[in-house]
Amino acid sequence: MKNSEIRPEKLHLRKLRKSLRKIRMKCLCSGEQMRHREEEDKKSEVGVGRDYNGSSALSTAESENAKKLDNGNIEEAELSLRETSSLNYEEARALLGRIEYQKGNIEAALRVFEGIDINGITVKMKTALTVREDRKHRRRSKGGFSTAPSPAMSKHAVSLLFEAIFLKAKSLQRLGRFQEAAESCRVILDIVETSLAEGASDNVTGDIKLQETLTKAVELLPELWKLADSPRDAILSYRRALLNHWKLDPETTARIQKEYAVFLLYSGEEAVPPNLRSQTEGSFIPRNNVEEAILLLMLLLRKVNLKRISWDAAILDHLSFALTIAGDLTALAKQFEELSPELLDQRELYHTLSLCYQGAGEGLVALGLLRKLFSEREDPNRTSGLLMASKICGERSGLAEEGLDYARKAIGNLGKECSQLDGAARFVLGITLTESSRMAVTETERIARQSEGIQALESADMTNPRVVHRLALENAEQRKLDSALAYAKEALKLGAESDLEVWLLLARVLSAQKRFSDAETIVDAALNETGKWEQGKLLRLKAKLRLAKGEVKDAIKTYTQLLALLQVQSKSFNSAKKLPKGYVKELMSLELGTWHDLAHIYINLSQWRDAESCLSRSRLIAPYSSVRYHIEGVLYNRRGQLEEAMEAFTTALDIDPMHVPSLTSKAEILLEVGNRSGIAVVRSFLMEALRIDRLNHSAWYNLGKMFKAEGSVSSMQEAVECFQAAVTLEETMPVEPFR
């Protein structure tokens, strides 16, 4: 076939391939190699007419896959030629770089891409994207026809160069040059962001290929900054990806939101709070990493519920972690409740909700959910649910019997399959047995349950500091102080140095042994081990120990230090973040107790005005406090105002009928009055006090006074026994309750 007989489009295609090969050689080869390849090209041109039917312009040695790649890129080149009448240097490099990248020749591709003058073509690309083809941007030609100003670069060329910049970033990434890769990738976003600001939205989003490259670049940039060990730039890139209008599809946006939330939670880099350019007044602005992550994950869950994105269980896992460390488990429970029913099994939902409410301090709500679970015949979480229910019941004296039943069922379900769960079950069983012993009707039953509870605890995992701490607590409350001290020390050895309650118990046991200096040494050691915000309870105990040693001025000084700490703590947290409900309650209780302790000190010093001042501060915190009304009654009693004292004690019992100090104080005043007809009332008050707290030495002492007032021989004998019990208990009484 002669050259004249070859169809024009075939000749055009052959010339185009030849041009591409020459440009490719210029990009990849040295000068000598280039001359050698040009000679080969001339030889191949001589036989082009003869060989056309049986071969193509490509070498027969090239693989079929390479042919497909070249054909695709030639089509790109032809499209560029149609739009601009020429294929310029940058576009040719973009095409050839893509060919090398697709073949896996990363270093060769990078050499080609580095030949593109990015700075030189940036302005042209921005101009091409911002040109509008509407009427107000058109101009009149001489013939009166309306023509659009043609940009220096076509949209297709812009798309081609965007892809080249993106592939350059990917090449740098694969070669481990992450900083350069991120800077290259950022160029795409900078160009588009500037163009969008000038109203080029339709030009960007209207081109499918360009939008696809932009989406990939937006998603890649934060990952590159993370690889470059630049977390702050990664955070800024994530925010840029989510706050700008890139027209990303929902799934891509969801992926970016999830990855950003994960980075905020686990990277260890504290992000600066976002400075939002446009926000409605009163809108929520996250103040730290956790809040920002929670916001992102909650948005993702809402999209899942609205079926805008597919379900991803990891979202819920990360949100559970974030809300747990934020101390807002009630909010986590709400998120679970709002999930679509088909996403979670009903039994799993109830079990998770019960965990949330238990962690939030709403044990009774959790128990109600668990009771619903137990009605199911087949529940995979049954054993763990039984243990949780038993623990909840064990913390409430009125539900101890129910908790005992749950614990025994859990042990029965386990058998010998899981030693760890068996140890946990025996731990919970020990707690419920010792708690239920307090409600025992007879002394025999009480002792039997206490003994069984101790045995259950000792059969639990004795390498667990929580188990050993519980044994120390039970022995301390039974006044087995030597055993309690040994267990408390063992708990510290097992790794409970960070557990404030173990330090407190150890110091309280020492104070019960009247070793006040040793107890203060333990408190000082604990102060060195704990953080500043956790020192409140330790400082209060230290003040009580100093008071027990007769160091009243030092005790008042320590209380003043504690109040200053509480004031600073309250202001700091109020300005920084929302506190968990339980923590706020604990702070208020600690401040309230401090004012009450100071009031007692000033009453003993007969400084009535100072005592009244402390009680006034207490009233501001809790207007209806049985403890405060009891202290007011003590103040009136010390001043000889018995009627006012009786009224204060009565008010305290109206607020809390089980307030033991008010029961004993009211009985004491009735005994002082000396009305024999009131003996029955005194007896009822004291017996109720001992039913609630059988180790209260003041109740035993006043009961002895009551028997002595009766005057009979048998009553005198009972009085002696009561006085002996009171003395024994007072000798082993800690400066503050063991729990």
Curated annotation (Swiss-Prot):
Polar residues bias spans: 53-63
SMART domains in the record: TPR
Ranges of biased composition (kind: Basic and acidic residues): 33-45
Pfam families xref list: TPR_16, TPR_19, TPR_8
Region of interest called Disordered, as start-end residue ranges on this chain: 32-71
Family matches, as PROSITE patterns: TPR, TPR_REGION
Entry comment describing in which tissues the protein is expressed: Expressed in pollen, flowers and fruits.
UniProt KW keywords: Calmodulin-binding, Repeat, TPR repeat
Domain of life, source organism: Eukaryota
Gene Ontology cellular component terms for the protein in this record: extrinsic component of cytoplasmic side of plasma membrane; membrane microdomain; plasma membrane
Molecular function GO terms recorded: calmodulin binding
Membrane among keywords: no
Chain positions of TPR repeats: 90-127, 162-195, 215-248, 465-498, 500-533, 536-569, 592-625, 626-659, 697-733
Self-association state and partner proteins as the record states: Interacts with calmodulin in a calcium-dependent manner.
Protein name: Protein NPGR2
